[in-house]
């Protein structure tokens, strides 16, 4: 476990801009003992029983204080604080970016990383790419903690849990009324609020809302999104507790698209005139029920059920056959899931058993050669894909001795599904019933507390991936096995002194049985990749007024077996050789704090043949915080001024090669943000 020490013109309908104001009316509600911790027992969520048993694995954790200090508008802005984690920002309004972890480059925009919110998966089975997820449905201020399980070490997720698991947990206890406001360059506005209200002696209500908008630094790059979440929990007595929660999100964004390399060098924040009408819009809503029952003092049962409905559309212009063409992708997604968790403690052992079922259906439409969102040809794809997943998992953590604390986990997944054409298609991708696939993934770890200062850990874990996209619905994929990933890791956590704390991890992950396409509709398991790397987190407090944090990750991902011999030994594209974040905070006065950050990102291959490379870059931020006097009537009020990209560095936040043309997503220029945080 890695945790910082305590010392240290479709124009679609616009999201409702009055969303935040409606929730903020609750700020005037009287609270019994505001800012005091509630005596009500919070309801638990899936996997929470495993929260204290992470010592055998690398699991960086960002707590509520870390999240509030970061003052971010988007959850993904936190990843720079996690060693080895990086975001390749596509700068495409409303479209998920690509998250890099453990030598994988396809998290978020693809399926290399699993993501959960209060134990429920955020990954989308067939949206754009298998495992796509959008964290903008989460309000940063509502989070209690964020944990990043590095590698396929968690039993909580199966498919998509390759590079690791992002585990988000919202606040479910306490009484609070918090507000965070930001405004700055390029029309940026972000307003968030989080409320914890005690209704009576047996009930609590938790609300969070966010409205964010911006004009963007480039032409036609405006965006707007709104999110509202609510959770009501009630204690019935006799060890029985229930919780009902819901979430609504709406977003729209315009996109100036990519630039050619020559265009970027000439005008870094410009726009290609061939891009017209690019952008996206999304609507998301979900509802869930949690029932907790205490079977005994040390044994707890959780039952849950949830449903999600979502629609998403994007328009994207890119090179195609010597010209630039716009494509349209539409997704209408519905999800239903349920599960049981049984957990307990017996002497020195903690255990968890789980059973869950999920059904996800996605209506998918794809058109090409549009002109400013106007279709000119029939649909290439018009179909519905369903994916059903039934899984069972178990984990045992046994504190036999401080020098030997093993963790044993096992997860079994079974998948079925079907593909049905909804209308005429011009595409030739397969669309039949999916053959049943199953996989069992073991997880083994051990931690050893040598003394008060030093803890060692080692682990071996396995993850897997199903055939991608519509390959799983092809008759020629009937005999395929899942792509398997096996990780070995060793690590240490060392408190060298009261001023210095270190965590180091070394890992090796080999993938086998990769899936390749031999001919239309025909596939086989062939291909291997080896990923190796190191991750370091350090916290140094040389004086009571100074704090330095350094997160560093180095990754090497190479192809070791491929049908194309020219690719053997090549680096996996879009994985930086290293990433580093150095942060400093100086409390120069009881009410004044100066802070800065320096982010380095190493060079990375852009294409599979490694013929094109994206150069290394670095970006610096500088900020000043002032704690406002209590006489203003606000609690914990802080006024902040932040300059992002202090030197106005011109850099590529991502590069790609499409139809033989090198394209650039320009990084954000220098921007100024004024922020205010307070409680009532």
Predicted regions and their residues:
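Surface-exposed extracellular loop regions of Gram-negative outer-membrane beta-barrel proteins
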Residues: 105, 252-254, 258-266, 361-373, ...
């Amino acid at each position: 476990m890695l945790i910082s020490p305590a010392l240290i013109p479709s124009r679609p309908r616009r999201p409702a801009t009055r969303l935040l104001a409606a929730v903020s009316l609750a700020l005037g509600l009287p609270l019994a003992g505001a800012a005091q911790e509630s005596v009500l027992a919070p309801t638990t969520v899936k996997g929470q029983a495993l929260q204290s048993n992470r010592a055998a694995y690398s699991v960086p954790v960002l707590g509520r204080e870390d999240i509030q200090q970061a003052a971010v508008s988007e959850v993904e802005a936190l990843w720079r604080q996690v060693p080895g984690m990086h975001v390749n920002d596509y700068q495409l309004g409303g479209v998920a970016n690509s998250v890099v972890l453990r030598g994988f480059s396809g998290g978020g925009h693809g399926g290399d990383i699993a993501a959960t919110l209060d134990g429920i998966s955020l990954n989308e089975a067939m949206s754009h790419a298998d495992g796509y997820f959008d964290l903008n449905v989460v309000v940063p201020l509502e989070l209690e903690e964020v944990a990043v399980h590095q590698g396929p070490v968690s039993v909580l997720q199966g498919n998509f849990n390759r590079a690791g698991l992002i585990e988000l947990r919202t606040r479910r206890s306490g009484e609070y009324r918090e507000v965070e406001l930001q405004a700055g360059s390029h029309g940026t506005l972000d307003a968030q609020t989080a409320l914890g209200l005690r209704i009576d002696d047996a009930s609590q209500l938790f609300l969070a809302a966010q409205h964010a908008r911006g004009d963007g630094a480039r032409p036609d790059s405006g965006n707007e999104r709104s999110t509202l979440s609510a959770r009501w929990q009630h204690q019935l007595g006799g060890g029985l507790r229930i919780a009902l929660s819901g979430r609504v999100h709406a977003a729209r964004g315009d996109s100036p698209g990519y630039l050619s390399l020559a265009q970027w060098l000439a005008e870094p924040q410009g726009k290609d005139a061939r891009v017209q009408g690019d952008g996206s819009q999304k609507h998301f809503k979900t509802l869930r029920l949690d029932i907790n029952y205490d079977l005994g003092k040390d044994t707890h049962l959780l039952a849950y059920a949830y449903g999600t409905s979502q629609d998403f559309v994007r328009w994207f212009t890119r090179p195609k056959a010597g010209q630039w063409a716009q494509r349209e992708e539409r997704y209408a997604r519905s999800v239903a899931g349920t599960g049981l968790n049984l957990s307990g403690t017996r002497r020195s052992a903690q255990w968890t058993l789980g059973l869950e079922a999920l059904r996800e259906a996605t209506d998918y439409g794809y058109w090409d050669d549009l002109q400013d969102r106007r279709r000119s040809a029939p649909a290439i794809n018009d179909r519905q894909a369903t994916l059903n997943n039934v899984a069972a998992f178990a984990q045992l953590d046994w504190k036999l001795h401080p020098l030997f604390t093993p963790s044993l986990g096992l997860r079994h997944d079974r998948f079925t599904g079907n593909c049905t054409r909804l209308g005429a298609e011009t595409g030739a991708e397969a669309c039949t019933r999916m053959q049943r696939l199953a996989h069992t993934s073991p997880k083994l770890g051990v931690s050893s507390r040598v003394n008060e200062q030093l803890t060692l850990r080692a682990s071996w874990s396995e993850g897997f991936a199903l055939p991608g996209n519509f390959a799983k619905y092809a008759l020629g994929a009937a005999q395929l096995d899942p792509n398997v990933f096996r990780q070995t890791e060793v690590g240490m956590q060392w408190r060298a002194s009261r001023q210095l704390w270190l965590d180091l991890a070394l890992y090796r992950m080999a993938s086998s049985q990769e899936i390749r396409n031999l001919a239309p509709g025909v596939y086989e398991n062939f291909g291997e990749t080896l990923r190796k790397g190191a991750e370091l987190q350090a916290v140094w407090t040389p004086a009571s007024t100074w704090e330095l944090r350094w997160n560093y990750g180095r990754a090497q991902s190479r192809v070791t077996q491929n049908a194309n011999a020219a690719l053997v030994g090549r680096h996996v594209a879009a994985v930086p050789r290293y990433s580093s974040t150095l942060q400093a905070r100086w409390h120069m006065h009881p009410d004044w704090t100066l802070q800065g950050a320096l982010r380095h990102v190493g060079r990375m291959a852009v294409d599979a043949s490694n013929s094109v490379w994206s150069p290394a870059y670095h970006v610096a931020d500088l900020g000043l915080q002032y704690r406002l006097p209590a006489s203003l009537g606000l609690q914990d009020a802080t006024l902040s001024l932040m300059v992002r990209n202090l030197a106005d560095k011109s850099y590529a936040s991502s590069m790609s090669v499409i139809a033989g043309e090198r394209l650039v997503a320009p990084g954000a220029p220098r921007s100024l943000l004024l922020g205010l945080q307070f409680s009532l």
